[in-house]
Each structure stands twice: as structure tokens, then as C-alpha cells.
A protein has these predicted regions:
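DNA-recognition alpha helix
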Residues: 56-77
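Single, function-defining residue in the core of a domain
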Residues: 1-58, 64, 120-122, 138-139, ...
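Active-site-proximal, Lys/Arg-enriched surface segment
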Residues: 87-167
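Short helix C-cap/helix-to-loop transition motifs enriched in small/turn-promoting residues
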Residues: 71, 97-99, 282-287
Length: 424
């Protein structure tokens, strides 16, 4: 694929593999009984809508239906007028999620084409974490109810959980959980980790997650899956976790580098509920963080308490203890990614009430995030600057391609058609 060195947002949108996606839509019967809102039209309309606003809604998506400028941009035939938000809601409920998952997979391959082998080696750290989004408007049909005290008189607000495996450039696996049982990270994170391990075409990946995963059984499943593909994981345990130590793993105890003090580095096993050692052998690294960290203030004015000591668990027996501690530090990158999605790509605004629709919106959000990261990399810009410039370029393109609403014809504006500049 011929990718410009410094592409505009319009050039990136024209790189979308529309022919291949149309073939997949036909083969997967995505457009069964759909005359107007086909999968391709929904894909293109939602892509532009995500780039245009930070507060996405079904009505906003429907308002772009009659924008014939977008019809020319994507080579689609669109009719004039609006599409009702109820029609969009119905399509979000019924369209197969696999079409949008496949679309994200194909579009993320564009990013792989501009990634060098050295950069790919740096992307072998896969951060896995979850982020909660609250349903403020009461749209969700199903959701988790968390954090509300009984007897306050306030109705329970439902929440949903986004869980993703992010390698720094693309999301290897993602899912949305609405069942209350998935409030525990012991269920959500292992499920996404195993999906990422099974779907990734790469080897030697290192999966990073926090201490929400503590189940001996789940850690064992992750250990077996990662070893099978020559991958590994680095997690975190509670400091009070009982460990059956079988031997010393390293010689770096007592070393301090970049504010990290290695206290102990041992081989051992976790104990099961019955008190017996588990069959899986791990490496346990206890570290102390010497750098003073200023905790962020919470709403109630209390300081958040950080542990000075951290207990890491891993099945990586070759890297040094300091290297593994450095890997775990990079887990924070996914928190920055979640923040970007919430602030710039409407992650916190729920535009569908069904789980099917929420998953479609999730993959659409990731598609646009991939385009933003490609634009950001090729134009040497930060994420906020990149998405700001992409929005301006898209609006400028629409302005330079006005539409004769009376006849429904495209009228491409030239420089001579623009109003003269004022001398004042």
C-alpha cells in the first residue's frame, strides 16, 4: 500500500480497504434486509462522526447521512436527508460485530506497514487493564451496579467494563462486560489475556496486568497459554500473599537502579485454597520504590496511599529482576490510552443500550484511534494535536466540497469559487 509520508486525514480515510470490507460484508451477510444502513455506510458515517465530535450520539451520526461530500470521499451512494436515530439504534442492535472486528483488523494492518522491526520489538509489551464507564442517562439494558450505598434513596446507576490488551500501537483483544460477575478482574482480565494470546500472530510477547488477577487457577491458565506460544507475563500480587519459596532466582538483591530497589528474587509456587503448593512454578520479585510519589487528591480530599513495596509474579525466568520491574512500569501506558479514548473519542458516552451495539461502537472507536495514531506517527505530532488537525482537515474538505441541496448533485469547489479575501 502506497502510504504518503505526511498524510492528511482525507488521504488516510481514502486508504481504508473498502473493497475488501465490502466483500467481507457480503460473505458474512452483514447487510441482510438492510437497504439504506448497510455495514459500509455505517462504517464510513461513524468514522467521520468520531472525528467530528467528542460527544457522539445516534442523532449526530444520522445527520451525516445526507452529506454528499462524504459520499464522494468514500465513493458511496447516499440519499439526501436524515436517517432517524431509531433506525441507527436498530442497526447497532442487529449488525454482526464480526464485520467491525474484521474492519479493525484490516485497518490496523496499515499501521503495521509503517512500523520498523526495531519498533515492533518495543511493542512486545502488552498492557492489559479495564476501565469502567457509568451509564448516567440510564440507557443500559444490562450493567453492573457498583459503588452505591443501600438506603440512600438514589437509584442504582449501571456501569460497564471495557477490558483491552494494548501493545502501545494497537489493541490485540478487547471486550465489554456488563454482567455483575465480571466486576472482579479475576474474570475479565484473564479472559482478554487468553483471547489476545490465541489471536496474536507474534511470539515473545510480555503481558502486563495489575494485582486484580489473584486466582491461582486463572494465573495457571495464563501461565500455560503464554508458555505454549513462547510468551510470558508479569503481574502483581498482594504483599500478604502466601508463597512457597523453592530457591533463589537472581543475584541482584540489594541493587538500586532508577529508584527501584530489588529486595528479593525467588522461585516458588502459589498455594491453593487447600493450602497445598500449586503445580505451576513462578518467579516472585519483591521491589521497593524509593522515589517519592505525590499522590493525587481524591474528591473527598484524602490522599491516595501508594505501597512502597510491590510483589511481582512472572513466568519469565531469563530477564533480570530490574528488567522485569521496568516492564511492569510500562503497564501505565494503557491508562494513558484509556484517558485519550474518553477525552477525544467518546468512550464515556454510551450511544447504544445493547451489548451488540456497544461492541460495534467499541471497534469503531478503535478504528478511529488507529487512524489517529498512524497520522500522529507519520506527521510527528502528539495525540491531542493529531486529532485536532484531523478534525480541521475534515471540516475544510467538506467546506471546499459544497453540495447543491436542491438537485442533490456534488459541486466541487475550486479556488476561483471561494469568496475573495478581505483586505481589512
Amino acid at each position: 500500500m502506497d502510504i504518503p509520508k505526511h498524510p492528511t486525514s482525507i488521504q488516510l480515510l481514502r486508504l481504508l480497504p473498502l473493497e475488501e470490507l465490502q466483500k467481507f460484508a457480503t460473505d458474512s451477510h452483514t447487510d441482510y434486509k438492510a437497504k439504506k444502513l448497510t455495514g459500509m455506510r455505517m462504517l464510513c458515517m461513524m468514522t467521520c462522526a468520531f472525528l467530528e465530535t467528542t460527544r457522539l450520539s445516534q442523532r449526530y451520526i444520522g445527520s451525516d447521512w445526507g452529506n454528499l461530500s462524504f459520499a464522494e470521499l468514500f465513493g458511496l451512494s447516499l440519499e439526501q436527508g436524515r436517517v432517524s436515530h431509531s433506525s441507527i439504534s436498530h442497526r447497532l442492535d442487529t449488525m454482526p460485530v464480526e464485520f467491525f472486528e474484521k474492519s479493525y483488523s484490516l485497518i490496523s494492518e496499515i499501521g503495521e506497514e509503517i512500523t520498523t522491526p526495531e519498533e515492533r520489538a518495543r511493542h512486545n509489551l502488552v498492557r492489559v487493564d479495564s476501565s469502567m464507564v457509568q451509564d448516567v442517562l440510564g440507557k443500559l439494558r444490562d450493567g453492573m451496579t457498583m459503588g452505591r450505598k443501600s438506603g440512600t434513596g438514589h437509584p442504582d446507576r449501571k456501569q460497564l467494563k471495557y477490558t483491552m490488551a494494548f501493545d502501545g500501537f494497537k489493541v490485540l483483544a478487547a471486550d465489554i462486560f456488563t454482567s455483575g460477575s465480571y466486576a472482579s478482574e479475576d474474570l475479565a482480565i484473564p479472559e482478554v489475556v487468553l483471547n489476545a494470546v490465541n489471536s496474536s500472530k507474534y511470539h515473545n510477547e510480555i503481558y502486563l496486568f495489575d494485582r486484580g488477577v489473584s486466582s491461582t487457577q486463572k494465573l495457571g491458565a495464563i501461565d500455560e497459554a503464554t508458555r505454549e506460544k513462547s510468551d510470558s507475563f508479569v503481574g502483581r500480587l498482594k504483599l500478604s500473599r502466601v508463597i512457597e519459596v523453592t530457591g533463589a532466582a537472581g543475584t541482584e538483591c540489594g541493587r538500586t537502579v532508577d529508584g527501584i530497589d530489588i529486595i528479593s528474587d525467588d522461585y516458588g509456587n502459589l498455594r491453593t485454597k487447600s493450602g497445598k503448593p500449586d503445580v505451576h512454578q513462578y518467579r516472585f520479585i519483591r521491589i521497593r520504590l524509593n522515589k517519592n510519589r505525590i499522590p493525587a487528591r481524591t474528591v473527598k480530599g484524602k490522599r491516595r496511599v501508594y505501597d512502597d513495596e510491590v510483589l511481582l509474579i512472572t513466568n519469565d525466568f531469563t530477564s533480570s529482576a530490574l528488567e522485569i520491574a521496568g516492564f511492569y512500569r510500562r503497564r501505565w501506558d494503557i491508562e494513558v490510552f484509556f484517558k485519550f479514548l474518553k477525552q477525544n473519542l467518546s468512550m464515556a458516552h454510551l450511544i447504544s443500550s445493547s451489548e451488540n451495539g456497544l461492541k460495534i461502537v467499541l471497534y469503531m472507536m478503535l478504528i478511529v484511534a488507529s487512524l489517529v495514531m498512524i497520522y500522529e506517527k507519520l506527521n510527528s505530532q502528539g495525540p491531542r494535536e493529531a486529532i485536532h488537525n484531523m478534525r480541521i482537515e475534515l471540516m475544510n474538505w467538506v467546506f471546499l466540497h459544497p453540495v447543491d441541496r436542491g438537485q442533490g448533485r456534488l459541486e466541487i469547489a475550486t479556488q476561483d469559487d471561494l469568496p475573495p479575501k478581505s483586505n481589512g
